């Protein structure tokens, strides 16, 4: 695989995020990536992930960005605010830069859930985020790649204005004739 990836990982809840990080790197390598093609950025907390991911994406050096963090619900509304902003920020960055962002930010009710999702019972969300990044990088590269063959004005075929399809069968002769007549150019009309 000839792709470059950036991983943005939060230092907050490092016990969990380090497990996510190691698993994400493992997922990229198992998918054919090279460790030299992976850049890592550490941020203080999950709230800082979207900005760092955006800056990495704007360089256009990466085929995908993997965002890793862990948010645990507390006793205040702070958790809900941060979850919403992180989710919105990561999605907005992906949409506005055109670079896929894999969401590997755990949003858990308690530490036990986070531990489970970091590889002890339910797989590892870091690994899953890496697989998403690989798939989306390949998908978007295929969409951006031009179709095979030359792409210049001389090679373009003229496409008829009305392609034949089932709807053409339902048009009346009057409609067909009206659409097939050449249009008059402005300024060529004479009054009598």
Residue ranges and their predicted role:
Residues 123-146:
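A charged, well-structured terminal subsegment
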Residues 141-192:
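Intrinsic disorder/low-complexity segments
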Residues 80-107, 116:
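Short, acidic/small-residue loops that bind anionic groups at enzyme active sites
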Residues 48-90:
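Glycine-rich phosphate-binding loop
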Residues 11-12, 70-71, 106-110:
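Short, ordered loop/turn segments at secondary-structure junctions
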Residues 109-123:
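Phosphate-binding/catalytic loops
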Residues 2-44:
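Glycine-rich phosphate/diphosphate-binding loop of Rossmann-like nucleotide-binding domains
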Residues 41-59, 105-106, 110-111:
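Glycine-rich oxoanion-binding loops at beta->alpha junctions
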């Amino acid at each position: 695989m000839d792709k470059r990836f950036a991983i943005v990982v939060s230092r907050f809840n490092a016990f969990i995020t380090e497990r996510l990080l190691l698993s994400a790197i493992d997922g990229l390598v198992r998918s054919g990536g090279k460790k030299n093609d992976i850049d890592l950025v550490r941020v203080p907390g999950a709230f800082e992930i979207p900005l760092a991911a955006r800056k990495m994406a704007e360089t256009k050096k990466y085929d995908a960005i993997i965002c890793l963090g862990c948010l645990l619900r507390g006793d205040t509304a702070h958790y809900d605010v941060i979850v919403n902003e992180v989710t919105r920020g990561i999605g907005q960055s992906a949409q506005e830069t055109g670079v896929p962002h894999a969401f590997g930010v755990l949003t858990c009710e308690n530490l036990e859930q986070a531990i489970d999702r970091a590889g002890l019972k339910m797989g590892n969300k870091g690994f899953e985020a890496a697989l998403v990044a690989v798939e989306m990088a390949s998908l978007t590269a295929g969409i951006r790649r031009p179709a095979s063959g030359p792409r210049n004005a001389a090679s373009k075929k003229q496409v008829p204005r009305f392609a034949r399809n089932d709807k053409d069968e339902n048009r009346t002769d009057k409609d067909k004739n009206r659409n097939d007549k050449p249009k008059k150019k402005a300024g060529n009309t004479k009054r009598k």
